[in-house]
Regions:
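Short beta-strand to alpha-helix junction loop
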Residues: 100-107
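A short glycine/small-residue-enriched secondary-structure motif
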Residues: 96-98
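Short acidic/His/Gly/Ser-rich catalytic and metal-binding motifs that mark active-site loops
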Residues: 89-94
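N-terminal Rossmann-like FAD-binding beta1-loop-alpha1 element of flavoenzymes
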Residues: 5-36
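N-terminal FAD cofactor-binding segment of flavoenzymes
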Residues: 29, 40-87
Length: 107
């Protein structure tokens, strides 16, 4: 029985934020390296864009020109709210009680 074989220098399991940024950085450091990124979703990043608040610092570091590349990040945050979700109830938390790292700024 014969099987098709594909050889890679690096295989990354999971196309989430960590796996995707690892693959990107590896290719930036060495464009000749063969990288395989395995993802269970129908396409890479399918589970990433979820309507969440996205801190763009990682994009700035990986792709300094990401805004010119027409990245699908268009909506700026105009209001902030922090809510704890329980099984049957929720609790709104005043944003002034949150640490600075939890505040959205310039996104």
């Amino acid at each position: 029985m014969s099987r098709e074989v594909m050889e890679y220098d690096v295989v990354i399991v999971g196309g989430g934020p960590s796996g995707l940024s690892t693959a990107i950085k590896l290719k930036q450091l060495n464009p000749d390296i063969n990288v395989c990124l395995l993802e269970k979703a129908s396409e890479i990043g399918a589970h990433i864009l979820s309507g969440n608040v996205f801190e763009t610092r990682a994009l700035d570091e990986l792709f300094p020109n990401w805004k010119e590349l027409n990245a699908p990040i268009k909506t700026k945050v105009n209001k902030e709210k922090f809510i704890f979700l329980g099984k049957s109830k929720f609790l709104s938390w005043p944003t002034w009680l949150l640490p600075k790292v939890q505040h959205n700024k310039n996104n």
